[in-house]
Amino acid sequence: MLIKYHLLLYFLFFIKCYPQTAILDLALKHPDPAIQEVLRNKEKHEIQILLTKIKRTPSEEILFEEEDYQIDERRYFYPASTVKLPIAVLALQKLNILKSKGVIITGDTPFFISTKEGDTIIQRDTTHNKGKLTLHHLIKKIFLVSDNDAYNYLFDFLGRDYINMELTKRGLNHTQVYHKFLFGADNVNTWEYTFLDKDQNVLYHQSSLHAELELKPNKLKGVLKGKGYNSLDVLVNKPMIFEQKNRISIRNLQGILQRIIFPDIFSNQEQFDLTDEDYKFLRKWMSRTTLESNNPNY
């Protein structure tokens, strides 16, 4: 973490002092021992860096200038919690698709989640001022505190097939979303979702979805990680295999951000199917901290 802060400070310094210079190159050549120690062991640390400068022409056209270090889309990159970003986006997109089919629900419509057998998974969210479980509130929690349960609930609202087909359709071809953040979770069959009006009448019910799309294992460089891991409280003394773990390349991750901030530079096919209000909502909560939120109030 300290190294990340060092690099960030150097980027800011060089942006101010050397505006026409290759900023990333200058930062990586800085004699700071922490940076140089990592660079001497760059294969061990699996460093990939993508720095993008945003420029506007006199006619307000958006241009991106990139600098990169060891970017390799053939090398596995585990996205960790950043995988929650496209899930939040696609939840809003699916809501728009449902509306276009005559389903009268919004991001603030309360719902509950149950199993196929009818057992309730969750019906209230105690972090909501009124105890409501809503799509908008789950998205807020993802951006504010990287809430794993919020991601899991949105994952199943979408279904794994929808997630991966939509991301591929948008040109994000180095991305696969395999799983929830829940030990022992069923990532193939979803829970059921029931949306209610203020009088508790059912507005929309989504039955369990079954994933049919066969996801190809990540046959990339670097899918073996570490030298041991815990499985059911037993130490396994060999690297963990990440062939069937979530994957987003750094360029695809940047591409998702660019589609949110600058959607108009992409073709209609590459853009997410979002409204202006959706974009405003995403940008607002992506930029907020817990101190700037009173619902949820952490």
Regions found by a protein language model. Name each.
Residues M1-A22:
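Bacterial Sec-dependent N-terminal signal peptides
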Residues A22-D32, K44, T115, T126-R259:
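Active-site-adjacent helix/loop patches that line small-molecule binding or acyl-intermediate pockets
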Residues K29-I71:
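A short, well-structured edge-of-sheet supersecondary motif
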Residues E243, D264, N268-Y298:
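Conserved SxxK-family serine transpeptidase/carboxypeptidase catalytic domain
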